[in-house]
Amino acid sequence: MLFRSGSVNPSYQLGTGSWDYLITADYVIKRKRFGLNTMVNYILKTENQKNYRFGNQTNYAATFFYFHESSKFTLVPQLGIAGEIYESNSQHGQTVRNTAGNLLLSKIGFEVGKNKFSLGANAMIPITQNLNAGNVEARYRWSINLNYAL
């Protein structure tokens, strides 16, 4: 995510210098070959050594999937939405203006598996956003993953 000036928002940098706590819930419902995976998590952020506290964050997602299984592999195409809600940052106990926001993304991807291995990829494109009073713009995201079941 970039400021319109081209610099990167500090809220999205690696490491906040604080201890943060994650509360998460995940639920999958499946009927025959169709399913829905839902997820919500809340990140409780604490103040760092510079008396700066990034705002708490809520993330959520709902992903529909279809499970196709053949004798050689499994294929699971996915389609859904994901969202993020950012509370305001604070410094020395004072709210930092224009640091809250929200983002809603569309999500498409797949997983392909064989034996204990699976490979997946997904892309996310913003549907609507209001980040840092419009000063930050989220662009597309993509990821790939490789898993091994123990």
Where do the PLM segments sit?
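Outer membrane beta-barrel transmembrane domains
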Residues: Q49-L150
